[in-house]
C-alpha cells in the first residue's frame, strides 16, 4: 500500500517536482 501511494503521489506531482532543482535532480525521469 505504501509503495502504491508513493507511486500515485509521484505521478500526480511529477511536473511540480521537476520544477524544483533539488527534486528534479533526485528524479531521473525529469531528465
From Swiss-Prot:
GO molecular function: acetylcholine receptor inhibitor activity; toxin activity
Keyword Zinc: no
Free-text note regarding domains: The cysteine framework is I (CC-C-C). Alpha4/6 pattern.
Record keywords: Acetylcholine receptor inhibiting toxin, Amidation, Disulfide bond, Neurotoxin, Postsynaptic neurotoxin, Secreted, Toxin
Propeptide span(s): 1-15
Expression tissues: Expressed by the venom duct.
In-chain residues carrying the UniProt-annotated modification Cysteine amide: 30
Function: Alpha-conotoxins act on postsynaptic membranes, they bind to the nicotinic acetylcholine receptors (nAChR) and thus inhibit them. This toxin inhibits alpha-3-beta-4, alpha-6/alpha-3-beta-4, and alpha-2-beta-4 nAChRs.
UniProt family annotation: Belongs to the conotoxin A superfamily.
Organism name: Conus lividus (Livid cone)
Pfam families xref list: Toxin_8
Protein name: Alpha-conotoxin Li1.12
An annotated GO cellular component: extracellular region
Keyword Transmembrane: no
Other remarks on this protein: Negative results: does not show inhibition at neuronal alpha-4-beta-4, alpha-4-beta-2, alpha-6/alpha-3-beta-2-beta-3, alpha-3-beta-2, alpha-2-beta-2, alpha-9-alpha-10, alpha-7 nAChRs and muscle alpha-1-beta-1-delta-epsilon nAChR.
Disulfide bonds: 17-23, 18-30
Main location: secreted
Superkingdom classification of source: Eukaryota
Subcellular localization(s) per the UniProt record: Secreted
Amino acid at each position: 500500500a505504501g509503495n502504491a501511494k508513493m507511486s500515485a503521489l509521484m505521478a500526480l506531482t511529477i511536473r511540480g517536482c521537476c520544477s524544483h532543482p533539488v527534486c528534479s535532480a533526485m528524479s531521473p525521469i525529469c531528465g
